[in-house]
Amino acid sequence: MKLSALLALSASTAVLAAPAVHHSDNHHHNDKRAVVTVTQYVNADGAVVIPAANTATSAAADGKVESVAAATTTLSSTAAAATTSAAASSSSSSSSSSSSVGSGDFEDGTISCSDFPSGQGAVSLDWLGLGGWASIMDMNGNTATSCQDGYYCSYACSPGYAKTQWPSEQPSDGRSVGGLYCKNGKLYRSNTDTNSLCVEGQGSAQAVNKVSGSIAICGTDYPGSENMVVPTVVGAGSSQPINVIKEDSYYQWQGKKTSAQYYVNNAGVSVEDGCIWGTEGSGVGNWAPVVLGAGYTDGITYLSIIPNPNNKEAPNFNIKIVATDGSTVNGACSYENGVYSGSGSDGCTVSVTSGSANFVFY
């Protein structure tokens, strides 16, 4: 199938984080939501959708899947679209993410598991009812509602940043685990290679909101539960950084690089209502109308606008990827009036070879 909007991904391998099934307290789970396709954008129904996985999975009506998808993204270089250099003002963030990131090193064994480490740069997600944590999971896939001994307590970071903590030894069944480890009632790093809890991404993308309502963009808790609970809220007329994962040095899933995935709710949906595991037909969370992808590898930033197979309805805004002043973006990518650029339903990806680009909501 000819995909005029398809871009070269230069033989890199990448896994696009996808949300796991919703789980209750102390419930073991092995299922994952779909991470789709290889070489071409293919969804569970065989339609071309998004570059992410080398094993297609079939999604049930409730958004669960029956198998775990691995991922190798290899897009043909012959499908690269024309290079564009677009002028677009890069708005400054409405709030400084660095102010909440925290500059102090995390000290093992000094903070109780019952206390959320807000002063260390982690962002508390109070609406989830987990004491501020994004998820709480042990190596066997059991979950809990409070951070306790033997569990990994995963957390969110400010927009533009990603967590640094996950154990090098991961479950053999394809699940991912991340966060601080609770032992003897105290929190410990699960990745002792770094003393900080959050790391800045590549800094090559922002979300720019030109519509009248706030937009809750919800990143997946990855490695971890993979639920879409990590918030980036972009107020009307403002902008926020998008965390572009530095794939070459970040978490790898079974030896494959991973990028970031964001579920975008309709404008006007609050973060408390939108950055959750949604229910069928709700239009929020994993049922949000559009998904974004972002990753940086081998000197190139890749940005995507992706259909959500759970929700075929168009959002109450349009979206396009636009180069910032002086930047170079290969390809064109937009979702306007319910139609993606290119074939109309496949989603689209651009490569930023220099500078940065904006996801513009209008």
Curated annotation (Swiss-Prot):
Belongs to the SUN family. Keywords: Autophagy, Carbohydrate metabolism, Cell cycle, Cell division, Cell wall, Cell wall biogenesis/degradation, Glycosidase, Hydrolase, Membrane, Mitochondrion, Mitochondrion outer membrane, Polysaccharide degradation, Secreted, Septation, Signal, Stress response. One of its GO terms (cellular component) is cell surface. This is Probable secreted beta-glucosidase UTH1. It comes from Saccharomyces cerevisiae (strain YJM789) (Baker's yeast). InterPro entries: Beta-Glucosidase_SUN (IPR051526), SUN (IPR005556). It is a peripheral membrane protein. It is found in: Mitochondrion outer membrane; Secreted, Cell wall.
